[in-house]
Amino acid sequence: MNKEYIYKKSSSLSVNVAASKVESLRKVVETTSTVRVYDNGLIGVAGQIGDCDMKKLEAEAIKNLENKIPYPCVPSPVIVRSENTIKNIVDTDNFIDVSKRLLARLEKETPDFLFNNKIQYYEDEVNYINDSGSNLSYKGNEFVIALSIKHKSTANLMDLTYVSETNDYDEDKAVQDVKKLYNAFNTPASIENGKYKVIASPAVFVETALGNFMAHMYASGATVFKDGLNKKILNDKLSIYADYTDDAINVPFFDDEGDVAENGKSYLIENGVLKALFANKNAAALYNVPRVVSSSASYDGVPLSLIHISEPTRRVVIS
């Protein structure tokens, strides 16, 4: 029998913004504990929110083997590593004042705009241990400005958005960024009939395209890239990888199954060559395919392989 232990702690501050004013502050601290056990090709999982007795949780996970959920134990290389990337980003003790100051400047610099939605701070801690000797731990934090913007003269519910995720907050830069949006919005554009390049968020179309690289779709032949593993399937200027480098903000260097990406990058496509597929360890073993380090799991669930694009917990980078 093999065992894994996962502990997560997430703290957050969230200011609700309405009509360019601070409306409320929400503080949340959540801890979760997970035990997974593997025996004879089966998995048992038990999880709990808040403080818990790990021995009791382990016993519950062992009992849950009776659910007979097939899942092989695929050991990762034994690694002992700890990273603490926490920075002094903002004054969290005076988070309302930080938010009010930013909103006051935005209101002054962009008087025709109304701002709504959230200003947030996250601090996360993750620890993964298995009985093979691996011990991985990570601490990180980030500051998120996620504002919807309405011009006072329009009937629209929302005209623009401004989103910034950073661990190096610069209030002046945030104001300058929004001022650029303001100036552009208030500059009439003369657009004639014709074809134009359109700039869109990758999530609009890329996530659907990346579905072709799920292991189960590939194995069933339901993907446009059938039999493409280790072959050049796209332009050699294109690389797509899960980013665990120092550039990734508040992202643990390991996934929820304890795998660590070599040099911080787990390639889906490297210079046009299909190197791996989106799969958890179960799917990778079932279909005998290499996998992108991208497993994610709820505190009381079996690991899944998910596609994450520019989310706080994981990044898929297209270069």
Please give the residue ranges for each predicted region.
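Dual-mode signal for accessory low-complexity, basic/Gly-rich regions
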Residues: 230-306, 310, 314, 319
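Active-site bordering "gate/hinge" segments
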Residues: 1-252, 270-273, 307
